Amino acid sequence: KQRAIRANKSGADICIRLHADAASANVRGVSVLYPSQQNHYVAKLSKKSKKLSKNILDSYCKSTRFKKRGLSKRDDLTGTNWSKIPVALIEMGFMTNQNDDLKMADSSFQQTMAEGIANGVDAYFQ
């Protein structure tokens, strides 16, 4: 909740939440979460948040060549439920998958990850 409030007060046009996922060791890839229209607290942000999420997912997966797991609507995350600006939560890979984890820990690959996200943000604003 506090991060969403901070983002709201920052004057930013969007909020991107960076996460790494966990599951069984054979699960890998990237997903991006956004608020659904069914959530009355953020329904008005859903369409823009979905566009932002899709742009980030497509660009990030193109840059990193990580498996694209898709978009997910979520209504149970305080970081999105308190947002007043379009918001996307990117699960950048799986820490429990050796391949994803090793890449995410590599500093040069982190630059590739950042570029993928930045390109998605650029696409959103075009």
Where are these regions (language model features)?
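Alpha-helix boundary recognition
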Residues: 5-8, 61, 105
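Catalytic-core regions of hydrolytic enzymes
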Residues: 1-52, 111
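Active-site-adjacent mobile loop/cap segments within catalytic or ligand-binding domains
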Residues: 17, 21-24, 33, 68-126
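Generic hydrophobic alpha-helical segments
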Residues: 3-7, 56, 117, 121
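Active-site-adjacent substrate-binding region
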Residues: 47-73
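A broad detector of the eukaryotic-type serine/threonine protein kinase catalytic domain
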Residues: 37-38, 61, 76
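Charged, low-complexity C-terminal accessory regions
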Residues: 41, 54-55, 63, 123-126
